[in-house]
């Protein structure tokens, strides 16, 4: 749920850092970062610092940073918690497209609409499994 963006770096630099850490060259890191930032609807905010972004924009940049290296497994805790309905839809559509590209996405959400789109659903109550839907 925490965004943990680096305050001294722009949005695109925050995303690039993850790509550079994966040993991508700077040009590829920047291209891939910009592609992801565009997919989350923030191309026009790419050169802004976290202090200049709203909470929802920071969340979308943090998601961009998490997926820029195309991880096989994505763990997301309330990935749309700070987002309005339109942006939440955009993020979940992006995550579900990634799922369809042989990736595993595990997410926690209080949003029943998005929870019901999952292939498998586990409901918790007071820290204990309440129901399990789907094959596990």
What are these regions (language model features)?
Residues 49-53, 57-58:
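Conserved ABC ATPase signature
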Residues 68-72:
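A short, proline-enriched helix->beta-strand linker immediately N-terminal to the Walker B motif
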Residues 16-28, 39:
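ABC-type ATPase nucleotide-binding domains, specifically the catalytic core motifs of the NBD
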Residues 9-17:
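Short coil-to-helix segment of the ABC ATPase nucleotide-binding domain corresponding to the Q-loop/switch region
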Residues 74-77:
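Catalytic Walker B motif of ABC-type/P-loop ATPase nucleotide-binding domains
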């Amino acid at each position: 749920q925490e965004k943990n963006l680096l305050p001294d770096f722009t949005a695109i630099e925050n995303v690039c850092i993850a790509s550079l850490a994966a040993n991508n060259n700077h040009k590829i890191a920047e291209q891939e970062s910009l592609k992801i930032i565009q997919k989350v609807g923030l191309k026009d905010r790419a050169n802004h610092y976290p202090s200049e972004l709203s909470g929802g924009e920071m969340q979308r940049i943090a998601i961009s940073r998490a997926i820029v290296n195309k991880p096989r497994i994505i763990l997301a805790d309330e990935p749309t918690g700070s987002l309005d309905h339109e942006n939440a839809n955009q993020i979940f559509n992006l995550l579900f497209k990634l799922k369809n590209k042989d990736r595993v996405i595990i997410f926690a959400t209080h949003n029943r609409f998005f929870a019901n789109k999952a292939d498998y659903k586990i409901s918790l109550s007071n820290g204990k499994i309440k129901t399990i839907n789907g094959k596990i």
